[in-house]
């Protein structure tokens, strides 16, 4: 999709975001990033755009781009195809690791808005786009790079007592939130607490996707979930708002023995 719309330079931010957004959920600060770029033929202009996107995303995440590897592999990749990968290293004091062990019944789930589907669900998105032409406004959202959450989340951790966090990636809300919950806890999510963005509603309609499948495939407008005490929600929302991020009180933690540790209301 990015190639078809001349947006390959945005994939660099997607790459960095997938690493550093995962990292900050445990309270770690990103230190450095390394990338790998390979293609059948390296085109200097397009390669430079992608690397620039990576560098800019690292800068926004206060993460040094130490270096990386580029490889030209004729015959290994189809024409105009490329492979982009990377990894990041961060640091957090052992006693400050956020692992969800402090999550208790009564704690609140604060959902932080996403910029779009981020980097997940695109196999399904592409199949839908083969059958239906998306309006310009919808396509713009589908092509938006993944939000970089380190700056707002690390400030949130510094100024509030975050109990747990989930980066909503593959598996959507349904699979990512339960990963941080102890046995005996259930996340009760109120679907009326926020509205699915128009791009997700368009995908749901054109793809004939059930709401339960939407919640298991896409982030549905929520890119990060932070779990806090009720008394800290207002402060947390002000911090996120200062970073131009909307947030929603999307549910509560309760006791329960459900097979799935998430329930939608």
Regions found by a protein language model. Name each.
Residues 14, 29, 69-70, 92, ...:
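Gly/Ser/Thr-rich beta-alpha loop segments that engage phosphate groups in nucleotides
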Residues 1-5, 122, 200:
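Short, glycine/acidic-enriched capping/hinge loops at junctions between secondary-structure elements
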Residues 105-136, 140:
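Acidic, glycine-rich loop-and-beta core segments that form the ion-binding/anion-interacting portion
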